[in-house]
Structure formats: C-alpha cells, structure tokens
Amino acid sequence: MLFRSLEPNKDIGLFYGHLSTAPGNFLEDMIVYRYDKVAEEPPADQPEIGEPEGVGLKRVIINLAKWGSVFQELKWFTEKTLEPKFESCTVARTSAMAQGEACLVTRNNPMHDSVPYLFNDLSDETDILHEYFIPRAAYNPFIAQAREILRNQSLPVLNASVRIVHKEDVALTYAPEPAYSLVLYINQPTDADGNARMRALTRALIDVTLKHGGRFFLPYQLHYTGKELLASYPELPAFLASKRQYDPTELFSSTFYRAIKALSGVVP
C-alpha cells in the first residue's frame, strides 16, 4: 500500500488521503496529499496564517452534496480537478510552477484551512465527525464492509479521509498497535429520526470495526452500547479504578466521564 511504502520517509512532513464520496467510486478512489519538508524552520518572511480562501464556495458545494448523486459527483470533481489550481501560495505563482501542490507552506496551513468550511451553521441539521482505527493488515477487508454499510443507509457522507496512526501508549489508547484511521464527516437532521439513524449507523460501523480488531474514537458521540465500549476499550475498568484511587471524591468529573462510567457498569 502507498501509505506503508512512504511512512518511513523522514522527508515527508504531512501525508494523508482524501477518499471519494461520489456514488460512482464511493470510498474507492483517493486523492493523496503529500507535503515534503524543505526546511526545519520557516523562512523569515513567511506570512502569518490568515483566513482561508474560498470558504463560502466550498461550503456551498458541501451543502449541495447533501442533495444527491449529481452534486456528490460535482463535489468530487472540484476536489480532484479544480481545487489544486486555486490553492493559495506563500511563494510566487511562477515559482510554484502554477500548481497548488507546489506551494511553500507551513505544516499548519493545510491543517488550518480544512476547518472553517466544515462548520455547519444551517438550522435543523448538523454534521457529525466519526473516526475508526483499524490495524493496518485489516484495513482492506474493513473498508470493503464499511463501504457497504455506508452505501446502504440514508445519511449523506460529506467527507472521508485516511491517515496514518502510530501506536499510542496511553491509558485509554485508540491505537494499541500501528493503525490506519478512517475519518468520516456525516450529515444528519437534528430531529428524533435523524438521531436514531445516526445511532444505528454508528453502531453498525463500530461493530465492523470491532470485527477487524479496531477501535472507535470515544468522545465524538455517545451512541455506542456498554458492550461495544468495553470491547473496544477493555482497559476502561482499570482506568476508572485508578481514577477512583487518585480522586475518591470525584472532584474532577464531567458529563462524558459520568456517561462512560455508567455504560461500563462500574458501581459509583
């Protein structure tokens, strides 16, 4: 796989894949973004990060993509063909060979620019972020099954990305071994029916993740069951026991903490 072959390259500063959400090649074709290191420090005249360009147009396109296959295909066409031609540069356009990919940027630029246009301020709907961490050897069978789940449900998938994840040695790790992460951005109505559909979809994706030895990211939505929670994070009871040991009065608490404690079945 391309990701596996490029990961050891220390000259790459940022690398990820953006999957198609168009029906014709849904979660099959991918745009790969690669940023090579040219210096450890930015040049002295590097501009400060400002407001990203084209946010309004990008948001219009992503909103249109909720309305069916024609607009989803249009979104993929603009991402694959048009956006690279209009990316802003911090060096002269002639020096950048008239290609957005050839621009000199800091690592913060691509990470910053992707956020504002994803913000949904429309009433009666919202966009929900999902992330699933899959052992690398299991990624191909996982994505095949995830693709079928997502195709056979009614909520619009607005964005899908794949990123490399290294082993994380923390108490509640989402990556006990090297993994690939599937990041999804899914639109839903905010009424009871929309919440029910999102809950069912989330649980289906969690179940296929667990089937392939993966884990889901805890904080996004509390749509998982206690069984799914403990299957994904078997360390949770020990974590909660340590929490009680060092904080017996539960001075440090939150709605999220109380929710996962209740789901885990741990006695208060």
Residue ranges of each PLM-predicted region?
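Noncatalytic alpha-helical scaffold of FAD-dependent oxidoreductases
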Residues: 1-268
